[in-house]
Amino acid sequence: MCYHIIAFIAGFVLDLLIGDPHFIPHPVRLIGSLISFLDKRLNCDAGYNSSEKKLNLTKYKRGVLLAFTVIFATFAVSVIILVVAYSINLYAGVIAEAVMTWQILATKCLRVESMRVYDALRTDGVEAGRRAVSMIVGRDTSVLDESGVTRAAVETVAENTSDGVIAPMLYTAIGGPVLGFVYKAVNTMDSMLGYKNDKYMYFGRFAARLDDVVNFIPARISAYLMIGAAFIGGRQFDGRNAYRIFKRDRFNHASPNSAQTESVCAGALRVQLAGDAVYFGKLVKKKYIGDRLREIEYEDIKRANRLMYITAFLCEFLSVAGMSLVLMRL
């Protein structure tokens, strides 16, 4: 257990220092390739002359098959890597576990991608900001003004504090890199298949629901950790308002989980997030999150990242403390 704690800490440090360099092949991209491969072969109507109801049921069943195939493949490969590494010697096992933990987390990657939006807005203006933010959000960015671009970037940091940092960290603390990568597989399936359009309405439904389930508890833990971060993060954050907006607006989203950390971030920064957005040429009505106590500005992207980092350090500290307590009882 002691070696697992060392690997867990080392993986977090590697994530903070190295992040996700594009020249290093990332396992999540391999998972995405598997999902794409299965999607092309399973999500089709060819050969079916059934009623629409039966066809939709078939799509749903195929989506379930895809999900379990991806989860099993991810689980099996992760186990094999660790077994082989630890069979060489203890040091190889710890190194493998640390590297896998590093690639599960996305703390620095989230900061780098969102700060590109900040840099673009600060140096080149709104058009450059639109191009930068289009790389990290799914909405139509061509209609966004500077406030809209900033809001999209802040929302991405807030939501992905849970999905990309805290949730995978918690699952890795509980079940090692194997469970961490299984979580990443579920999260990747949701991001690729969880659309409410004709192609994925039924085929991607199981993946989307599974993602809601695995994120239900971590999203709420993330929110409370972020509230704590707002209280200890200095005068730029309003901890009391973060808690107030969280209690009021944490369900102002179609997903039961997404507004948990978004509401905390909105309250901590004293800005208003969410609201209507354009996706694939269609206006999607969304509730607002937070109160517009001041106008949002591109500096809020930097503040949101600071809040995310403090939250990540809190989670790492508490996770290591919890793992150490378990070790002491063994």
Predicted regions and their residues:
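Hydrophobic alpha-helical transmembrane segments
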Residues: 1-181, 186, 194-330
